Amino acid sequence: MQQFTVATARPLPVIILADVSGSMTQDDNIGALNAALKDLLSTLSKESRLNAEIQVSIITFGGIKAEVHVPLTPAWQINQTSDLVASGGTPMGGAFELALEMIENKEIIPSRAYKPTIVLISDGVPTDNWETSFNKLKNSDRAQKASRMAMAIGAGADKNMLKAFVNDLEASEVFEAHNAKEIHRFFRAVSMSVSSRSQSNTPNQLPTVDFSKLPDDELDLSDF
């Protein structure tokens, strides 16, 4: 009797690097970020897994260190996450190191996975040696293939640093957010980009994101 092998969807990793420093309490930006992340996870969990399985990890950096808040997990399996809590400094370099470790670990992200998307959110200036860690990330054989997007929250964000983080594979600019609605719009762009890739026959071909053309007439800010 002939046996058939059922093909499994290839992972499409999305790694979110979230600033949870003390300054994120200003204007309740941390609350807006929590609500936007929940909306993102809810949307991605509903995507088809025929071609690609979207997997999400959240790495936070605040206090004195970075840590993995949500390990890389299929989006449809993430039922709920604890809210991010803001405090302390901005150890962004530590987040880059954790992201690099995750991408280089083939038990976490196998060779058959599609190119990762790394999303950086920050409202301030890094308080550690971020340059060394970032150079390792962008020069790594595996990590350099990732698409990198960034959002600056408020006037205090280090926009030059964030511009250095962004590459030209997917979104060629830093999105600037000054309120909850704009934070939400950025994550809608992330969701649209990742969803588009997961439904494509060529998920490694990265779409262009034009932040100026994002619709905002359907936003529900009741959770903010």
Q: Which residues make up each language-model segment?
A:
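Von Willebrand factor
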Residues: V6-H69, N79-Y114, T117-I121, T127-N129, S147-M161, ...
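Short beta-strand-loop
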Residues: A52-S82, K159-N167
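Extended acidic, low-complexity intrinsically disordered regions
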Residues: G154, N204-F224
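Von Willebrand factor A/integrin I-like adhesion domains
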Residues: A155-T208
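Short glycine-/polar-rich loops that comprise or flank the Walker A/P-loop
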Residues: P11-L12, Q144-S147, L169-S172
